Amino acid sequence: MMVERLITQPRHIEVQVLADQHGQVACLFERECSLQRRHQKLVEEAASPVMTDAHWQTLRESCTRLIRAAGYTGAGTVEFMYDPHTESFAFLEVNARLQVEHPVTEMITGVDLVQWQIRIAQGEALALAPALMNGDRTAILGHAIECRIVAEDPSKGFMPSIGYLRGWAAPMGPGIRFDTGFGPGREVTRYYDSLIAKLIGYGATRDEAEPLATRP
């Protein structure tokens, strides 16, 4: 029998890391992905509204030790469960890839994670701003929130829905990033995830980012 500690009202916190082949590890702050359905993330934001400087130093040090001990290189995500009652973090896993929600980290750091993943694979050394390399939270540029847009049928319990996109109007404007591979006339097939787009709202504060990410 295996017994695990129960965490009530948990929050899903993950740290974006970049590690090169020369021993350097950059922890590019955290994302919060607590809003989920059926254990699937729906809304992600950076940085987490519950993160403190003390918590961040603990997470950053833990992630750096883990990545170096594993000899990991490239882009990755270290995931934790946060217990708000004990203010403690429980390690979940390392995702050895870029996450769907990586754009919110790009927005608040100005770092192109896709580009750096390739450059690291080519043997380049990380050359980010010192504040980013050191995990200094003064380097965080505003706040970003990502909402996943999915092809699902609300009349059938939000089951994935297939078919052709008859209409498509991508949101535009300052503070908005819209990532997708779909457009009018494209087919949503049964062979892939129901995710068809990501809407990212960015602002100087969380209050500024929220209405951009949730606009109708």
Language-model features: locations:
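ATP-dependent carboxylate activation and anion-phosphoryl transfer catalytic cores
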Residues: 1-216
